[in-house]
Amino acid sequence: MNLGEFLYKLVHATEPYEFILHWGMYKDLLEEYQLIASSEKYTKNIYPMGLTDIINQNNTDFIPYFMSEKIFFLDNNIIHTMLNNEDVQVPYDYSIMLDTNYTSYIKWFLNGRNQPHLLENYMNLFSSGEDKFTVSNPKHLAVYENLYYVELFKSIDQKKYVECNKLEYTISENEARQNTDRIISLFYSGNSKEILNKFIDLHQSMTLLLIGIWQIQFGSKASAKNKMKKLFKYVIDKVGIFYEREMVIALRYLEDTKAVSMLNKINKGGKSLNQKELLEKVENIAWDFIVPRVMEFHVNTNKKYSYFIPFFLSHDKKLKELIKLFNIKGMLLHRKKDEYIPFSNLDTTDFFDKKGLFNELKTLRENEILLKREMVHEENINNNFSNKVKEIKTLHEILKK
C-alpha cells in the first residue's frame, strides 16, 4: 500500500462512506495525515449562512477553493470518535483572499477615492530583493496603503453598518497602522522571506511554462496532441517541475483556445509589445495562475490549529474562470511535515491516456528524467531563471511573424 493508491481511490470516491472506508484500509499509513474532502452526496453545508447563495449567483466575485460546499474532515482521531458513537467536534475556519485590485476598491469604499494599486506593486516589493521598506518609495507606499485599508475594512462594525448604514471601526486608525507595520516587518523576517522566495520561484517557473505554451501554440501547426508532446519535452528541458493542473489546462487550450480565456491575453495580431513589455505581461498572467497554490499554502500553514477553508475574491472575469477550470475535490495534509497534496475529481493519468499522451506522462516519472528535471529546476533557481530572457525572445519573434 502507498499514498498514491490511496489518492487514486479518493479521486474516484463519491459517497462519504467511501472516503471513510478507504481511510480505514490505509489508516496505518495515514497516522500523521488529515483530510479535507468534498462530496455532493454529503448532507451538510459548512459555509456561513447565505454564502452559498452568493457563490451561486451569476458573475459572483466569490470563488471557493473546493468544488463543493459539502465538506467534511477525516483523521484517525475523528474515525475513532465516530466508531465510539461520540459527538465529533471539528474546528474549522474560513479565509478570504483578495486580489490586489480589490484592495483599491476597499480604499474607494472607505474613502470615496479610487487609487488602484496593481499586482506589480507587490511583485516589485517582494521579488526585488530589497532589504529595506520605506514609504518614501511610491511603490512601497502603495502596498502600505492597501494593507492599511484592508486592516480597517476587517474591523468594520458589521452590526452598525447593517442596521444604520454607517461605517465605524472596532480599532483605531493608529491600531490599523500598527497592524500594518507588523505585517510589513513579518515580510522582512527570515522565515517569511524564505516563504516569499518559494512563491517567487513558483512564479518564475510558471512564467517559463506559460512562455512555452505560447511558443508551441503559435510556433507550430501540429495537432493539439503533438503540440502537447512538445510541451512535455519543454517541461523536462526548460522548466523541470511538472505542474499537473496547469498541463491539463494547457491541453484544453491547445485543443480549443476559447476554452481558456486567460491564455488568450497573449495572441498574434494584438498590440505590438517589445520583449520587456511582453515579459511583464506574461509575468502578470503567471501571478494569476498561482492563486490556487497560494490558497493551498494557507490551508497548510493553519493545519495545526484548525481545518481551513479558503475563498478568493476577484472582479476579474478571466481569473475567476481560470480558478474554476480545475475543480479541487480535497486535500491531504501531513500534520508535522510541510506536505500537502490537493486532488481533483479528474483522474489525470486517465485524462492524458485518453488523449494519447500516456507515454509522455510515464516518461516524466522515469528515474533518469526525474533526476534531469530536478537538475533543471535547481539550475533555474541558481541562475535566477535567467533562461526566461532567451525564451521570451523566442516567443517575441514567433508572435511577430
Predicted stretch roles:
Residues N2-F308, I323-K401:
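Active-site-proximal, substrate-binding regions of enzyme catalytic domains
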Residues I309-L322:
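Extended hydrophobic secondary-structure segments that form protein cores and membrane-embedded regions
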